[in-house]
Structures are given as C-alpha cells and as structure tokens.
Amino acid sequence: MNLLEDTLKSCPIVKRGEYNYFIHPITDGVPLMNSQLLREVATKIIKISDMDIDKIVTAEAMGIPIATTISLYTDIPYVIMRKRKYLLEGEIPVHQETGYSKGELYLNGVNKGDKVLIVDDVISTGGTMVAIIKALEKAGAHIKDIVCVIERGNGKEEVKEKTGYDVKTLVKIDVVNGKVVIL
C-alpha cells in the first residue's frame, strides 16, 4: 500500500489565478494529518537517505512534522530554519525566493563540520532549498543528503544547477484537469 500516492490522487485542488494548488496533509497540514501517512513518509526517507548524520535540517512550517518523525525514529536531533530572527550568536540569515513568496530564513544550531540531512515537504521552484543549502554552506556544515517528499515542477533541476546538489524525492506529481497525477 502506498498511502502517500493514494492520498495525493484524492486531494482537493484549489485554483488561485492561473495556478492549481493541491491541498494535502504533508504540504498543508489539512484536511487531516494521518499518523500512518507521516510514518510512511518518514520511514521511506530514512531508507533512501545517508543517515550518517549529526542533525536533520528543515524549513518551517511543513517540514517540521517530517523532521520530528524522522528524529523520533532515529534519535537524531533536528533544526528548524525559521522565518523570523532570534538574534542568537551565530545566527545565519539567508534570502529565500519561491514562485509565490520571498523573505528571509534564519539558521541556528548548526555548527562547522556538522553532517546534515535536509528534509522538506515539497520542492517546486527550488527557491527554499537553495536558501537552505546556502545557509548550511555558510555555517560550514557537510550536506550528506537532501530529500523532499513531493516533487512538482523543475525545482530539482534548479537546485542542481544553482548548488550542484541532487535532491531525492518520494513522488513526482503534476496537476492535470483538476486532479493530481503521479508521474
């Protein structure tokens, strides 16, 4: 059984302007986050990732439940790149631009030489991932692996082109005729 694919195929689509947004528990936290789905996603990420790491890194907000679940399974701590400053010593700000927003992300709690796994809910334009990578490089961290649950658009290619890193994903989708299609 593949709960991730099953729930994607049946998730609602909302049109905003010319863009079709899929509304799914992994990417939006609504309509309902199923614990079985979260466990499935976390175990699949663990299986395909280099887990010789010191920390799991994600961006707020929807990467948080994924990173938390992986942390609970592995006893590896996680760090959240936040959208607001905390003004802690060593805080690293980085500019983020996606297809629908821009702003700053702030990294705390990652040290030079830390081996990290980056996880996130979705990659579409690659803007968030490029920002995370830049902040981690500035911190002197060693990025061991990058995994996003859902791939939509050309974000993987953008990340590879701009940073040299490959991004693994669990499922690639598109929205066609008002429905999610697994590619």
From Swiss-Prot:
Superkingdom of this protein's organism: Archaea
Reactions performed catalytically: IMP + diphosphate = hypoxanthine + 5-phospho-alpha-D-ribose 1-diphosphate; GMP + diphosphate = guanine + 5-phospho-alpha-D-ribose 1-diphosphate
Localization, UniProt: Cytoplasm
Molecular function in Gene Ontology: guanine phosphoribosyltransferase activity; hypoxanthine phosphoribosyltransferase activity
Pathway(s) per entry: Purine metabolism; IMP biosynthesis via salvage pathway; IMP from hypoxanthine: step 1/1
Enzyme Commission code(s) on record: 2.4.2.8
Extent of the signal sequence: none
Listed SUPFAM superfamilies: PRTase-like
Top EC class, one word: transferase
GO cellular component annotations of the record: cytoplasm
Quaternary state and interactors: Homodimer.
Main function: Catalyzes a salvage reaction resulting in the formation of IMP that is energically less costly than de novo synthesis.
Descriptive protein name: Hypoxanthine/guanine phosphoribosyltransferase
Naturally occurring in which organism (per UniProt): Methanothermococcus okinawensis (strain DSM 14208 / JCM 11175 / IH1)
Lineage: Archaea, Methanobacteriati, Methanobacteriota, Methanomada group, Methanococci
